[in-house]
């Protein structure tokens, strides 16, 4: 069954969290209950799942404080991060606009630096993760190297209505953000300036998809969505029916690789 959440739903589940060895932050739960929310609400900890974990969408927005640094770490689930606001750097690479980062399980990444303004990013997972494994303290957990390191960054093209963004699109514009790989990993930006039907790849070609509305409005199956609404589609479901609003939409589709 498709999971759907609006921006308002996430902000209604917003919690302050002080990273033990890092910055102050706010975490807004959009889909599922993540490890931070469990800690804040005093819920019992969940044990790690065997890899790959069962399909379970968990999505949240992180607001990382200005002039802060989130240390390097890794997770035990595959994930995407979509940077939507603020400027900073990811490792040595600058973040100056909307950016997509993917990191497969057991792949160290970061640090994430926020500059003079807070930085906001969505973390999107398709399975349970018990929390960050900080480096270098948890380096021993990587010694077996059962899972190859795999991560990368993709810049989101200018959106409709932005400077240098597309105008008067005839039909639908599809732009690669993360080029698709044979196992299904990839991300595509779909843009329109009118009401069109958007057809993405079959979810069966990967291990689940997130659809994140970056601008405008569209419906995803029976759900009406606007900016920063999102949906998760399991790999055993049909491709969602996505219909842009009368003035168009910019919507990002992110697909996890098969395991």
Residue ranges of each PLM-predicted region?
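Structural motif
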Residues: 99, 228-229
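Short, low-complexity cationic-aromatic patches
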Residues: 52, 67-80, 113-117, 196-211, ...
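The feature marks the first
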Residues: 46-89, 93, 98
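Short, flexible domain-boundary/linker segments around small modular repeats
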Residues: 53-66, 181-197
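Ligand-binding loop in jelly-roll beta-barrel domains
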Residues: 94-95, 105-134, 224-226, 235-259
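Glycine- and acidic-residue-biased ligand/ion/polar-headgroup-sensing regions
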Residues: 65, 75-93, 200-221, 227
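A short, N-terminal "cap"/entry segment at the start of jelly-roll beta-barrel domains
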Residues: 1-54, 134-188
């Amino acid at each position: 069954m498709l999971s759907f959440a609006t921006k308002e739903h996430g902000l209604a589940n917003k919690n302050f969290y002080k990273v033990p060895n890092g910055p102050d932050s706010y975490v807004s739960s959009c889909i599922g209950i993540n490890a931070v929310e469990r800690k804040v609400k005093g819920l019992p900890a969940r044990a790690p799942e065997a890899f790959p974990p069962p399909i379970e969408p968990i999505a949240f927005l992180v607001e990382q404080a200005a002039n802060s640094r989130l240390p390097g770490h890794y997770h035990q689930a595959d994930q995407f991060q979509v940077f939507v606001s603020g400027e900073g750097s990811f490792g040595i690479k600058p973040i100056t606009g909307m950016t997509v980062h993917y990191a497969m399980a057991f792949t160290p990444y970061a640090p994430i630096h926020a500059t003079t303004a807070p930085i906001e990013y969505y973390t999107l997972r398709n399975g349970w993760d018990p929390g960050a494994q900080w480096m270098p303290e948890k380096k021993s957990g990587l010694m077996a190297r059962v899972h190859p390191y795999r991560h990368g960054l993709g810049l989101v093209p200018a959106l409709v209505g932005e400077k240098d963004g597309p105008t008067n699109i005839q039909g639908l514009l599809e732009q690669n953000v993360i080029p698709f790989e044979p196992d299904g990993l990839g991300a595509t930006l779909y843009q329109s300036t009118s009401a069109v039907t958007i057809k993405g790849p079959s979810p069966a070609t990967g291990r689940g998809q997130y659809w994140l509305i970056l601008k405008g409005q569209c419906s995803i199956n029976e759900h009406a969505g606007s900016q920063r609404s999102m949906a998760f589609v399991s790999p055993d479901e049909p491709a969602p029916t996505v219909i842009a609003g009368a003035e168009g939409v910019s919507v990002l589709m992110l697909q996890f690789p098969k395991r």
